Amino acid sequence: MEKRVLIWDDGLNYVNYMEVLRAVDLTPVVGREAAGLCAALLLPGGGDIADRLPEDEIRTIRAYAAAEKPILGICRGMQALNVFFGGTLYARVPGHQVKAGDILHDTRAVGELAELVGTAPRVNSNHHQAICRLGRGLGVRQWAADGVIEGICHSRLPVLGVQWHPERQAFALRRGEAADGAAVFWWLRRQAEKNSGG
């Protein structure tokens, strides 16, 4: 049965996300809502988050969380999850953003993320906002050497967030010097298979 994943549409280019979802046999649906809930929700990278998330994004995350459907947050998406669960963000952290391309840096991972990418993955990042105070129910699973949070999981829900960009480091885009981003999307596939909707 087809498993659809809603990619939250923030008006950006989602080609890499769509390609990697198809590579793990998931069907991407780009929009701010779908007819009924999909099997999973993907919150992609994007622009800055102000003090509050847009109401339609809050409603969408709330619907997927209430239905215990898997949610994957990438870069801005991880930050959005943290804000949704009551956390806060630093407006600007140095050393994690460049004008073009990504910064590669070493991290430490534990728990679910260590199972996916190992305990000392090198990851690709490009961001200037970062988690300050962690949201309710969230646990840190990955850190950069400077202490910036690079990965989170929810204690009860199938929610995973990464500050880095696995879609730029998976399948045809994979570079040998960084963690295999495909593992994150295989996680989403496994979670979607456990899900009856989509």
Where are the predicted features?
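Catalytic beta-strand/loop module used to bind and position nucleotide/cofactor moieties
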Residues: 161
